C-alpha cells in the first residue's frame, strides 16, 4: 500500500523494497475494491517476477494461492491462530467459506482437532485448497469440499464441536446451516464488518435470529480482529 502522494514513485519504491527483502520475488499493488461473487480483487505487478501466484507463510503453514482469483487476507493471520488455540483436543471443526484453506490448515496445524472440514464455492480457491492440504501434509486431518454450503451442509451426517464462518459480510444469513450441524454446546465463530456502535446491536440481532431458528445461543465474546476502515472493525 503506497500513499497517493507517492504514486508516481511506486515502481521505484517497489524495486527498493525487493532489494531490501531478499526473500521476496514480486511486489504488487492491490486494488481497494473487492468485486464479484467471490470477493476477489485486481493487483498490479510493480517489480520482480511477472506472476500473481504466491506462497504465503503463516502460523506454521504454507498457503499457495493466486492473488486475483482467490479471496485472502493476510491480516487475519492472528485471528486464525486465535481460533486454533481455542480448539480442544478431539474437536471436529467445520469451516464454511474456507477459500484456499487458511483456516482449516492453521487450525489443524496448531491444535489437536480430530478433523477439520472446509467448504468452498469458488472452484479456483478449492483447487488451491486441495493442493495446500497436500503441501502441508495434512490430508489425514483436513477434508475440503467444493460447493455451495446451502447444498453441501444439510446432507452431512456428522455434527461439529466448532463452526467457523469467515465470511466478512452477510454471515448471519447462514446461521441456520451452522446451527443445523452444531453439536449441543458447540462454539460458532461469526464475522462481520461493524462500526463501534453497531457491535452490541448486532450481537442482539444474532441472538434473535438463532432464537427464531429454535436454537437459543449465548454470546460468549465479541472480539475486534481487524480494522476495515477508520471506526469500522471486523
Please report, for each region that a protein language model flagged, where it lies by residue:
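SAM-dependent transferase fold signal centered on methyltransferase-like domains
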Residues: 1-234
Amino acid at each position: 500500500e503506497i500513499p497517493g502522494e507517492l504514486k508516481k514513485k511506486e515502481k521505484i519504491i517497489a524495486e527498493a523494497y525487493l532489494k531490501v527483502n531478499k526473500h521476496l520475488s514480486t511486489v504488487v499493488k492491490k486494488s481497494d475494491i473487492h468485486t464479484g461473487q467471490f470477493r476477489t480483487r485486481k493487483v498490479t505487478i510493480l517489480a520482480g517476477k511477472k506472476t500473481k501466484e504466491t506462497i504465503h507463510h503463516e502460523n506454521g503453514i504454507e498457503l499457495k494461492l493466486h492473488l486475483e482469483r482467490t479471496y485472502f487476507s493476510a491480516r487475519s493471520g492472528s485471528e486464525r491462530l486465535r481460533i486454533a488455540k481455542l480448539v480442544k483436543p478431539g474437536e471436529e471443526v467445520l469451516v464454511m467459506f474456507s477459500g484456499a484453506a487458511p483456516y482449516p490448515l492453521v487450525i489443524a496445524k496448531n491444535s489437536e482437532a480430530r478433523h477439520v472440514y472446509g467448504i468452498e464455492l469458488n472452484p479456483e480457491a478449492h483447487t488451491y485448497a486441495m493442493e495446500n492440504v497436500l503441501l502441508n501434509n495434512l490430508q489425514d486431518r483436513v477434508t475440503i469440499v467444493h460447493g455451495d454450503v446451502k447444498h453441501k451442509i444439510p446432507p452431512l451426517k456428522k455434527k461439529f464441536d466448532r463452526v467457523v464462518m469467515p465470511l466478512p459480510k452477510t454471515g448471519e444469513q447462514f446461521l441456520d446451516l451452522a446451527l443445523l450441524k452444531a453439536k449441543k454446546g458447540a462454539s460458532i465463530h461469526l464475522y462481520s464488518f461493524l462500526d463501534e456502535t453497531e457491535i452490541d446491536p448486532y450481537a442482539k440481532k444474532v441472538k434473535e435470529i438463532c432464537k427464531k431458528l429454535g436454537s437459543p445461543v449465548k454470546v460468549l465474546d465479541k472480539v475486534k480482529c481487524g480494522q476495515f476502515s477508520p471506526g469500522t472493525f471486523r
